[in-house]
């Protein structure tokens, strides 16, 4: 088994790269998706978030109001640390269970947005960083996710710098390119990962 850490700044196009890797046969463990699951209505995770931040972070249907919580934590590093302290241990536990269920020769790709920030690179056999220019990230966040420029810049500023991410990368996937070019690059990376999985 080859354990791959996949990361990249918000709006860099990490989801597209992970989707292409899954098409090739990777087992994907998506930390963002798991992070949503562990704070779904009725979970201990959501109860802990409400205990820390108050009932104002709940939507009318009892689910987590993500934009509301985001506006609180992304403007305050201490509050962000509190949220991460609740969610990250739950995500780790679920990720471990999914990895243990994968085949011995699998390429297991952990899609981890805050891999750099949390110093998680040593946990993986290989780190793949999806990279895009800050202007590209900003454009995608405003155009595709409907964020205001201020919100988008705050999210970007709360993450590691482009240089910090590239520093921990074993492989960099440049995503300032057209989709076809990205596909070709991901195919090259996949071939490298498969070779790695069979020599582990």
Swiss-Prot record:
Record InterPro entries: Depp_CoAkinase, P-loop_NTPase
Taxonomic superkingdom: Bacteria
CDD domains: DPCK
Catalytic activity: 3'-dephospho-CoA + ATP = ADP + CoA + H(+)
Any GO BP: coenzyme A biosynthetic process
Name by which UniProt lists this protein: Dephospho-CoA kinase
Species this chain originates from: Streptomyces coelicolor (strain ATCC BAA-471 / A3(2) / M145)
Swiss-Prot/TrEMBL keywords: ATP-binding, Coenzyme A biosynthesis, Cytoplasm, Kinase, Nucleotide-binding, Transferase
């Amino acid at each position: 088994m080859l354990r791959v850490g996949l990361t990249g700044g918000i709006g860099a196009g990490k989801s597209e790269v992970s989707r292409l890797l899954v098409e090739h046969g990777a087992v994907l463990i998506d930390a963002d998706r798991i992070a949503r699951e562990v704070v779904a209505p009725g979970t201990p995770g959501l109860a802990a978030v409400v205990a820390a931040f108050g009932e104002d972070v709940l939507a009318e249907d009892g689910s987590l109001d993500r934009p509301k919580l985001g506006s609180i934590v992304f403007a305050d590093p201490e509050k962000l640390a509190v949220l991460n302290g609740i969610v990250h241990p739950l995500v780790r536990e679920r990720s471990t269970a999914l990895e243990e269920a994968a085949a011995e020769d699998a390429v297991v790709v952990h899609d981890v947005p805050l891999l750099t920030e949390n110093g998680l690179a040593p946990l993986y056999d290989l780190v793949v960083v999806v990279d895009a220019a800050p202007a590209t990230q900003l454009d995608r966040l405003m155009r595709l996710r409907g964020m205001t420029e201020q919100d988008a810049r705050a999210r970007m500023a709360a993450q590691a710098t482009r240089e910090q991410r590239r520093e921990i990368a074993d492989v960099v996937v440049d995503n300032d390119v057209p989709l076809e070019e990205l596909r070709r690059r991901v195919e090259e990376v996949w071939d490298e990962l498969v070779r790695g999985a069979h020599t582990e």
